[in-house]
C-alpha cells in the first residue's frame, strides 16, 4: 500500500503546513503513500514536480521515477528513503536535507538487506549524511548518480558518498561524488564492481576493507587525500584507473594479496598539508605498498609525483614489470634486508632517469637500474644528511660502493630496464 503525503509546493496552508509535515517526518518513516504518484503501468510510478517532506519506506516492488522538479526533503532527520523489498528502482529523484547522524546510518537512500536487486539510478543527492547505504543486500546497482556532501561539515563528520556493507554482487558505475568523506567505501563486500566513477575533493576516492574478488575499473580520482585506499583485501583487479593531483597517495596497498594492478595512471601526487594518520610518512607517493605480497603490478604509469613507489614492511614476492616511472622527484624508496628484482621474463620497467645504454638495440638497457644505494638509505634515516649531498664525504661513500660492491646493501634492482615507455597494459 502507498499512503499519501501532500506536496508542499501545492499546499495552500503555506509555511505552517510545511513545518507540521516536517515535524511529523522526524517522528517516523511512513510508507510512500500520499505522494501524488501517477501509475504508468507495469509497476512503474511517477512523482510530479514539487517539494515533498518526510521520511519514507518503500516496502513493495516498484519503479519510482521522479519528474523534473520533484524534490524529496527529509527534514534533517533519519534516512529519506528506506528500501525493504526486492525489485525496487529509484530513478531521477532530487533528495535533500536527510539526517546527518552517522551512528544511526542516516542516508539519502538506505537499501536494506531484503531489498535485493535494488537499482538506484540517475538521482541527485546533496547532504551531510551518507548518500547511498547498501546494507547486507545482494545484487544492488548504483548507477549514474550525482552525490555531493556538505562542505560546511568537517570531512570526518560527513558520510560516505556510497557505502557498501556486507554486500554481494554490487555494481557501482558512472557516479559523480564530491565533498563527502569517502567516495565509495566497500566493507566486507565480495564480488563487487566499481566502474567508471568520478571522485573529487574527498578523503579517499575508493576505499576497500576486508573485501575479496572485486574489480575497480576505469575510475577517476582528483584532489583527494588518497585516490585508491586498498586495505586488508585479496584478489582485487584494479585496472584502467586514473589518479590526478591527489594528496599523500595515488594508490595505497595495505595488506593486499593476490591482486592485479594493471593499466592505471597516477600523476601529480603531492605531499598533503597533513599526513595520513594511519601510516606515517605521506610524502606524496604515487604508489605505496605496505605489507602486501604476491601481487602483479604491470603496465602502470606513475608520473610527476614527489615519490614514485615506496615498498616497506615485508612487501615481497610481487611481480613489478612493464611500468613507467616518469619525472618523479624520487623514483623509489625501499628499505629492507632482501634484494628485490623488478623485472619479469626478461622485461623490466621504464625509468625516466635511467642513464644506461642499449648497444644491441633490443629495447633493453645493458646496465641494470639500481635506484637506491647506501647514501639514499642514510638520507631516509637521517634527513638532515641532505645538507651534505654535494660534499666530498658523500661522494667518497658513493665511490666506495662502486669500488667494493660487497658493502652494498640489498635494494631494488631492475636487470632489464626499458629504453622506451611501454604500451598500455592490456586488460585482464
From Swiss-Prot:
SUPFAM superfamilies with a match to the protein in the record: Pectin lyase-like (SSF51126)
Signal peptide annotation: 1-29
Keywords: Periplasm, Repeat, Signal
Major localization listed first in the record, in broad terms: periplasm
Compartments where found: Periplasm
Top-level division of the source organism's lineage: Bacteria
Coiled coil (residue ranges): none
InterPro entries hit by this protein: Carb-bd_sugar_hydrolysis-dom, NosD_copper_fam, NosD_dom, Para_beta_helix_rpt-2, PbH1, Pectin_lyas_fold, Pectin_lyase_fold/virulence
A GO cellular component entry from the record: periplasmic space
Residue ranges of PbH1 repeats: 85-113, 115-136, 137-166, 167-188, 189-210, 211-232, 233-255, 292-313, 315-353
UniProt subunit comment: The complex may be composed of an ATP-binding protein (NosF), a transmembrane protein (NosY) and a solute-binding protein (NosD).
Role noted for this protein: Required for the assembly of the copper chromophores of nitrous oxide reductase. Could be part of the ABC transporter complex NosDFY.
Family statement drawn from the similarity comment of this UniProt entry: Belongs to the NosD family.
NCBIfam families: NosD_copper_fam, para_beta_helix
Name under which the protein is recorded: Probable ABC transporter binding protein NosD
Gene that this sequence comes from: nosD
Amino acid at each position: 500500500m502507498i499512503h499519501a503525503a501532500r506536496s508542499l509546493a501545492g499546499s495552500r496552508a503555506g509555511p505552517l503546513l510545511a513545518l507540521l509535515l516536517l515535524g511529523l517526518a522526524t517522528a517516523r518513516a511512513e510508507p510512500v503513500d500520499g505522494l501524488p504518484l501517477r501509475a504508468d503501468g507495469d509497476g512503474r510510478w511517477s512523482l510530479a514536480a514539487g517539494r515533498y517532506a518526510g521520511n519514507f519506506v518503500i516496502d513493495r516492488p516498484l519503479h519510482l521515477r521522479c519528474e523534473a522538479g520533484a524534490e524529496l526533503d527529509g527534514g534533517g532527520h533519519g534516512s529519506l528513503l528506506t528500501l525493504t523489498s526486492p525489485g525496487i528502482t529509484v530513478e531521477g529523484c532530487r533528495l535533500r536535507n536527510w539526517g546527518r547522524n552517522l551512528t544511526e546510518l542516516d542516508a539519502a537512500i538506505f537499501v536494506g538487506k531484503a531489498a535485493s536487486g535494488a537499482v538506484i539510478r540517475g538521482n541527485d543527492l546533496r547532504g551531510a549524511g551518507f548518500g547511498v547505504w547498501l546494507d547486507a543486500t545482494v545484487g544492488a546497482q548504483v548507477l549514474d548518480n550525482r552525490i555531493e556532501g556538505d562542505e560546511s561539515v568537517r570531512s570526518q563528520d560527513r558520510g560516505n558518498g556510497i557505502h557498501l556493507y556486507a554486500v554481494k554482487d554490487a555494481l557501482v558505475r558512472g557516479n559523480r561524488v564530491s565533498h563527502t568523506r569517502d567516495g565509495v567505501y566497500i566493507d566486507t563486500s565480495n564480488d563487487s564492481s566499481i566502474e567508471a566513477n568520478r571522485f573529487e575533493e574527498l578523503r579517499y576516492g575508493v576505499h576497500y576493507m576486508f573485501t575479496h574478488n572485486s574489480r575497480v575499473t576505469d575510475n577517476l580520482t582528483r584532489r583527494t587525500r588518497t585516490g585508491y585506499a586498498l586495505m586488508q583485501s585479496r584478489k582485487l583487479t584494479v585496472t584502467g584507473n586514473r589518479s590526478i593531483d591527489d594528496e599523500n597517495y595515488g594508490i595505497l596497498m595495505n595488506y593486499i594479496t593476490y591482486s592485479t594492478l594493471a593499466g592505471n595512471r597516477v600523476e601529480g601526487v603531492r605531499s598533503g598539508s597533513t599526513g595520513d594518520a594511519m601510516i606515517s610518512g605521506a610524502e606524496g607517493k604515487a604508489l605505496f605498498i605496505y605489507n602486501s605480497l604476491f601481487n602483479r603490478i604491470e603496465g602502470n604509469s606513475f608520473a610527476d609525483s614527489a615519490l614514485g613507489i615506496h615498498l616497506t614492511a615485508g612487501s615481497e614476492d610481487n611481480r613489478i614489470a612493464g611500468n613507467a616511472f616518469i619525472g618523479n622527484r624520487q623514483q623509489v624508496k625501499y628499505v629492507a634486508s632482501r634484494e628485490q628484482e623488478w623485472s619479469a621474463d626478461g622485461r623490466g620497467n621504464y625509468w625516466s632517469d635511467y642513464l644506461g645504454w642499449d648497444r644491441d638495440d633490443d629495447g633493453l638497457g645493458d646496465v641494470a637500474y639500481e635506484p637506491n644505494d647506501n647514501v639514499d638509505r642514510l638520507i631516509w634515516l637521517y634527513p638532515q644528511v641532505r645538507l651534505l649531498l654535494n660534499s666530498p664525504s658523500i661522494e667518497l661513500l658513493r665511490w666506495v660502493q662502486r669500488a667494493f660492491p660487497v658493502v652494498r646493501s640489498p635494494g631494488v634492482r631492475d636487470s632489464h630496464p626499458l629504453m622506451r615507455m611501454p604500451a598500455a597494459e592490456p586488460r585482464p
